[in-house]
């Protein structure tokens, strides 16, 4: 009788340990999900910022080209004089 009680107590302890481990892992999974969501949001924000910077860069390049064309035209006129 005491042998089976001992085995039962060991089994109960192992089951409790497994439950505790599962609970901790579930908590860790939730934390990782939250971190993943946060990082996904940061990636999205970074992509939007990059797109905005690319648009601004293209606009500035267009302006630079416009100024270069004007400068070339002015230099051409000066050579004529």
Curated annotation (Swiss-Prot):
<dbReference type="InterPro" id="IPR009252">
    <property type="entry name" value="Cell_div_ZapB"/>
</dbReference>
<keyword id="KW-0175">Coiled coil</keyword>
<comment type="subunit">
    <text>Homodimer. The ends of the coiled-coil dimer bind to each other, forming polymers. Interacts with FtsZ.</text>
</comment>
<dbReference type="Pfam" id="PF06005">
    <property type="entry name" value="ZapB"/>
</dbReference>
<feature type="coiled-coil region">
    <location>
        <begin position="5"/>
        <end position="81"/>
    </location>
</feature>
<protein>
    <recommendedName>
        <fullName>Cell division protein ZapB</fullName>
    </recommendedName>
</protein>
<comment type="function">
    <text>Non-essential, abundant cell division factor that is required for proper Z-ring formation. It is recruited early to the divisome by direct interaction with FtsZ, stimulating Z-ring assembly and thereby promoting cell division earlier in the cell cycle. Its recruitment to the Z-ring requires functional FtsA or ZipA.</text>
</comment>
<feature type="region of interest" description="Disordered">
    <location>
        <begin position="36"/>
        <end position="67"/>
    </location>
</feature>
<dbReference type="GO" id="GO:0042802">
    <property type="term" value="F:identical protein binding"/>
</dbReference>
<keyword id="KW-0132">Cell division</keyword>
<dbReference type="GO" id="GO:0043093">
    <property type="term" value="P:FtsZ-dependent cytokinesis"/>
</dbReference>
<feature type="compositionally biased region" description="Basic and acidic residues">
    <location>
        <begin position="48"/>
        <end position="62"/>
    </location>
</feature>
<keyword id="KW-0131">Cell cycle</keyword>
<feature type="compositionally biased region" description="Polar residues">
    <location>
        <begin position="37"/>
        <end position="47"/>
    </location>
</feature>
<keyword id="KW-0717">Septation</keyword>
<dbReference type="GO" id="GO:0005829">
    <property type="term" value="C:cytosol"/>
</dbReference>
<dbReference type="GO" id="GO:0000917">
    <property type="term" value="P:division septum assembly"/>
</dbReference>
<keyword id="KW-0007">Acetylation</keyword>
<feature type="modified residue" description="N6-acetyllysine">
    <location>
        <position position="10"/>
    </location>
</feature>
<keyword id="KW-0963">Cytoplasm</keyword>
<comment type="similarity">
    <text>Belongs to the ZapB family.</text>
</comment>
<dbReference type="GO" id="GO:0032153">
    <property type="term" value="C:cell division site"/>
</dbReference>
């Amino acid at each position: 009788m005491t042998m089976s009680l001992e085995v039962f107590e060991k089994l109960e302890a192992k089951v409790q340990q497994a439950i505790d481990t599962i609970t901790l892992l579930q908590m860790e999974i939730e934390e990782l999900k939250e971190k993943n969501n946060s990082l996904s949001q940061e990636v999205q924000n970074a992509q939007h910022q990059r797109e905005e910077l690319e648009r601004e860069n293209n606009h500035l390049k267009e302006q630079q080209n416009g100024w270069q064309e004007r400068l070339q035209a002015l230099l051409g006129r000066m050579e004529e004089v």
